[in-house]
Amino acid sequence: MNPPKSAPDAQGLSYRDAGVDIDAGDALVDKIKPFAKKTLRDGVLGGIGGFGALFEVPKKYREPVLVSGTDGVGTKLKLAFHLNKHDTVGQDLVAMSVNDILVQGAEPLFFLDYFACGKLDVETAATVVKGIATGCELAGCALIGGETAEMPGMYPDGEYDLAGFAVGAVEKSKIIDGSAIAEGDVVLGLASSGIHSNGFSLVRKIIERANPDLSADFHGRSLADALMAPTRIYVKPLLALMEKIAVKGMAHITGGGLVENIPRVLRDGLTAELDQRAWPLPPLFQWLQQHGGVADAEMHRVFNCGIGMAVIVSAADADEALRQLTEAGEQVWKIGTVRASREGEAQTVVV
């Protein structure tokens, strides 16, 4: 059977006519290879571009357990589009996953990213991936692969979405699951760099209501830069701490804030009582609360309120842990203690 003949005046269609530019995709791969190369570490087998990425678990592990995490950047991307600022969201993407797997004691080994858009802008995508590589360097993990999906009609021009995937390893005997947490333990709070990557739907609503000048000075930088500050990556100082001190539990303070994330590592019958006077509420959160009329309780369940990671140790280890983390460059406060829960009480209370 012969194929149907084209009409004499019909023009042949190409993938580019359909909105997908293969040449742009190839150009992006060439641009990002040097960024990925800077993240290489022991265990990486092969380079970018294969069907699958290969990684050999380091031989230092006797009984390695793999720990995986995946996340995105949420509606912080909407603010990035509005500001045309794409250099920090890549670090946000890495931080959200590596900080999550870190809380179980895992050393991040490698990271993969997914970049989806309607029309690929090579420069914008390369800027995002450069930020991803920066995040991987800060976390000590390798950027070993990813996917760039150009899907015409799926996203408005100038917009994209991101997803990240991190895999780490922890010695089976050293998994941190919160089971050792007991009454009298101390909750340390490590400072956040800002809003991080959660609560931006509320942030954007507050901006809509307040209509501020985002380019105006805000404590030494623009308000836009304060809002877009990349999520802090806690991997290296906390891995070093775990080598010296028995860390009983950790909580990455993401969506749900302090009051919904700390309970994820507490056994039934235990409550973390946090003293909100123990650490300063950063000016950016004060600005959000003031301009949005946000209640204290809502602030604590939406935003990190200045604490990006909670670390639980015994009272005997608290001072030494605080000293080590401070020497490593972290701002740290004793923000609370663990005690027996009272009837009907939440597992984390802020007083």
Curated annotation (Swiss-Prot):
Pfam families listed in its UniProt record: AIRS, AIRS_C
Localization, UniProt: Cytoplasm
Catalyzed reactions: 2-formamido-N(1)-(5-O-phospho-beta-D-ribosyl)acetamidine + ATP = 5-amino-1-(5-phospho-beta-D-ribosyl)imidazole + ADP + phosphate + H(+)
Main subcellular location: cytoplasm
BP terms from Gene Ontology: 'de novo' IMP biosynthetic process; adenine biosynthetic process
Transmembrane region(s): none
GO molecular function, one term: ATP binding
Pathway named in the protein's UniProt entry: Purine metabolism; IMP biosynthesis via de novo pathway; 5-amino-1-(5-phospho-D-ribosyl)imidazole from N(2)-formyl-N(1)-(5-phospho-D-ribosyl)glycinamide: step 2/2
Name used for this protein in its record: Phosphoribosylformylglycinamidine cyclo-ligase
Source organism superkingdom: Bacteria
EC number(s) given by UniProt: 6.3.3.1
Entry-linked PANTHER family: TRIFUNCTIONAL PURINE BIOSYNTHETIC PROTEIN ADENOSINE-3, TRIFUNCTIONAL PURINE BIOSYNTHETIC PROTEIN ADENOSINE-3-RELATED
Alphabetically ordered keywords of this record: ATP-binding, Cytoplasm, Ligase, Nucleotide-binding, Purine biosynthesis
Record's keyword annotation contains ATP-binding: yes
Cellular component, GO, one term: cytosol
Presence of the UniProt keyword ATP-binding in the record: yes
